[in-house]
Structures are given as C-alpha cells and as structure tokens.
C-alpha cells in the first residue's frame, strides 16, 4: 500500500477499531517496520459506529472536524459488524459507497483527498462456550458483508483488506482464544489482527519479536492514553456541550478552561509521537513537555451564597478533622460511630464514591481524586483501594492500591476480580499472583456514556439474576456492542443491566434526570433513587415484558447520591430490611424508611422512621454505604466544600482533592456479626451460604 514519509493515518470504525488503541499492537508493528517514516497515527474508533450512523453526545465535534484536526492523509476504515445484524448487505454497500464519495471530495490536509483503506469485519470466533453464540449465523452474514465491501472497494478503486477470512482461518485452526466474547478481540487477538493488517499494508510479515517492539509499544500506549483523553474527553457536556458556556467568576466558562486543556493534550500527544519514533530507531527518551502551555487559572466562586431551603449548599475550605466531624453527628438511638479510615491515616483515600465488601470481608473503596476528571500535566490518581481490618478492631490497618482507574464511578465484585466503570469503558480487573494488585485488565465493554461524569454509570449492584445493575443520568449517550445483537444506542437516563458471563446488555427502565443508587432486598424486590429530585422508586414488571417504576416513599430531601437496604444481624432488629437514602445538601445524612409489603399486589411502600444519621458539618457528604461482614454500617464521606457539578467551574480550586473518610456505625451493646468467611470455601458450603438470611453473605457466596 502507499504509505509515505510523515503520513498521518487515522483509524475509524466500530469497537474493532476502538479497542485496538488500548493494546497498541497495530501502531507498534507499523512504527517498527517503517522506522524513519515518522508516522502519526490517531485512533478515532467508537463503539457502536456504523458507516452511515455515528451518534455522539451534544456538541461533540463532527467526524470531519476531527479528521481535519488529525490531518488525515490515510484513513483505515473498519465497519460492517454492527450493520451485519440488519442482514442487508446491499444497503450497507450503498452507505459505504456514499461515504467514500463524500470523503474523497474533501481534504483534511490541504493537499488532496485522503487515501482510503477498507477493512472487512473480523470473523466471529466460536469459543465453545454455552455463554456465547457459536457464531455460525454471524459468520454467514459477515461473509456477505465482506463480499459487499470488497465489491465496493473494487468499484471505487480503494484498497481493501479481507480480515474476515484470515481471522476465520486463524480462529478455526487454533486453541487460543482471541476474543473475550466471540467478537471483541483480547490482546492476543489484537496482536494477531495487527499482524494481518501490517502484512497487508507493508507487503511483508512484521517482526513479532523485534528487539525494540516492547519499548515502541510502551511509548504507543502512553501516547494513546493522552490522545484518548483528548478525543474521547470525558465530561464532554462541559467541554463542548450544553454546560460548556456556563459562566462563573469574572465571566470565565468551562469552555475557556477545558478547550485549553484540549490544546494541552494536543501538545502532550504530539510530544509522545517523538518518543515512539525514537524507540523505533532504538533510542530511549522521555517526552519533553516543556512546550505545553500552562493551565488556565481559575478563581473560585465558593464565597457566593448558594442556598437550598435556607441552608447553604456549599461548605468551608476549613475542614473539620474526622473526630470533629463525628462530634457533629447525631445518630439514631442505640447507634454509635467510629472512624474506620481517613485521609489522615491514608492519603490515598480521597473522594470515596462507592464502597463494597469482598469475599474476604475486606472493605474496598473507589476514590476519585481527579473529580470531575483527570487534568493534563497532573497525576492521574483515581484508585480502587482495599482497606483491610486485620485485627478486627473496626479500624482499617493499612491501604492497598488494587489499581488506578480513571473516573471509577462504580464497581462490583465478580469472578475473583472486580468490574469497574471507567467511562466510556467497563473494565474487568483481577489479581492472579496474590499481591492484591491487579495484573489483569480487560476492557469488557465500551460505549458507555461519558458526557457528564458525575452521573455516568454508577451504584453498581449485583442482582439476583446474575446481572450487574447500574444507573446513569442525563446528557450521556451510550452505544454498546454485544455478541448478541446490533449496537444498542441510548440517551435515556435510568437503569441498565449487564451480564458479565454472557455479555448481554440492556436498558432496564427510565429514571430521570440524574439516576443514582440501586439496591435489592431479601425478597429480590428492586429499588432505585434519583439524585436530583431525591425520589425513590420500586422497580416493577409491566405487562409488556419490561419494567416500570412506582413511587416508593414521600421524599423530603435532595440530592441523593446513593441508597441501600439494611441487612445485618448486628444492627437493631428495628432497622432490619429498612431502606436508607443518603443526602448531601441541606440535610446531610441518612434517611431511614421501614419497608411495608402488600403481599396481594407485590407493592412495597416506605414509611419514614427516625433519621439514621444527620450531621451539622457542612463538608460532610455521604456518598455511599454498605454493610460489612461484621454487620456494621460503613458510610463513605466525599468530604468536600463543593458538591455541585454545574454550580462551579469544573476546575474551581475549591474542589477538594485531599479529603475522604469512611465511618463505621455500630449498635451499642449488641454483638458484631460473625464473619461468614466466603473466600476459598468449597462449592457445597457456598451453596449452604445461599440460604443465609443476610443479603451481603448470599451475594458474596
């Protein structure tokens, strides 16, 4: 193929293209084999894209704008998988032809139209698993779409690479699994396909064990991280969407600040191209970022009065100590509180957004130090933390960083590891060598909405059906690919569910506008809350095979970041089965509702009881809660003077990036629960634990 010195190659398409950037094999091979060409390669892939339909969140730059930004000389186009589910290869060929004609009529460099290379979809891999399709029907359709694409390429005189037949042969002749679900490539699969592509582009087989390949790939992945955060900039509604022009102190807008960050990322990305070129030549160098313009200075508006119901929405930059904050708490009768962990004990504990208990009984926390997203030129310090209490005294003894994860808005344990949101991706992380640090990292799903991080995928809860449920709020547009059906596009706020075993994904029910918090009770009844309005709902089946929501209780507070059902043999019996909602403005604490069941209709109603917890510390922001294996209630405190997302500039310097606490609430004079010790127990004993009356024990079993 015609690859020239200094070419800018842009990869576009669906998840096949999108996922390539995270493993970096294709660019690594091309840079290795064409060292001295100083290629600039940018990935514009997007899960769910079709050649004639590429939805984006409001304000996201157009495809042409981004191709111009990347100065595309060559376009690698990867379409066909999502279209194949419509079984209309003729219609696909028409759309592909129109796109080629339109693209060849443009220039993104000022020096003529781009050279186009069409890549067929890969084959569907039969993993021999009952969890996934065998791919026979998929491959019949994909073969048809491959033939249609080849015919279009011949007619329009553009390059064509047949990945379908080459991957089909490789899949059929190897015992190696190249995909995670039949269609989405793992690292081995991306390396395989990168080899096929590189050989087609170069005319020779790339050296898969080149002495510089590892250093090239390391540099490529670093560059791709910076480019990904530019092209797929999270919190895009503040970058280019409806809230980008919100004006704060001195008329400064989010647009002013965040578009400057995009410029910074352009420099950071280009600087790393030079590191790649040096690595290809066998030289080791570090990126020189001295040319990156400094960040825009932002002045806080924290001093401006903001009230809700006569109470201040904002706190103070003078933070109470954890002990002072506990002294400001009023608890329900018979309860007491102690500090489990804080930033004073563990500086890594900053902005805890969700907590959970693993099968060893250890508390985990997702901490979001970079909220609302990572800032260029600073450390990406969001984490999944483990906080073991080895001596069982109710205080964490140490902290372990399991993994660094950007924007970890929700997580749930599964299959010996943890599934965590890092929008737009859903990750599976696992430790396989026993050091409590993740050494497996798999993007198991892409296309989650990321336009507004503060209500992107959150509040993960493992359902009794084996699905992981989460909520997602407004402004976000998701476009998810699965092995089962065409891309699932949705801009609806509400509940979604994902089966980590089969990779089935579906929208569950609407919950406008800012959905946070989902939980299940002993009987499997399902509940959800909305942060903005503070409303709580029971999720019930309807007559059409779907689900609706009905009012669970009379809400009196807002906003609500989380909710849960109490299930503990330690806490007072009067609290057992009660529904608890957390609130972070005006009323700072936890509301408590007794759930009353109508066994005739199946409807559940919440009746307000004594507040579980209320604080007069204006920086107390309870974000999540969970019951530990000792039966105590653990409450994560965001601990921030600022709680509003849109009320302050995204980079307001009063947004705190240093504080975070976890408090432990116990019942005075009542024995703690005996830990179930789920980890490592044989299956017969785990089956017995499924009869345990405590929800958390059954879930962990």
For the regions a protein language model found, what residue spans apply to each?
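Serine-esterase "nucleophile elbow" of acetyl-processing enzymes
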Residues: 1-46, 63-71, 75, 193
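Conserved catalytic region of serine esterases and O-acyltransferases that act on ester linkages
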Residues: 4, 21, 177-317
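Structural recognition of the beta-strand scaffold that forms the well-ordered cores
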Residues: 8-12, 40-45, 73-79, 115-120, ...
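Oxyanion-hole/transition-state-stabilizing segment in secreted/luminal serine hydrolases
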Residues: 12, 22-24, 56-94, 124, ...
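Acidic/histidine-rich helix-loop elements
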Residues: 43-58, 182
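A short helix->loop->beta-strand "cap" motif at the edges of active sites that frequently abuts
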Residues: 104-115
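Beta-propeller domains with acidic blade repeats across secreted/periplasmic ectodomains
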Residues: 109-111, 295-689, 696-699
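Substrate-gating cap/lid alpha-helix
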Residues: 126-163
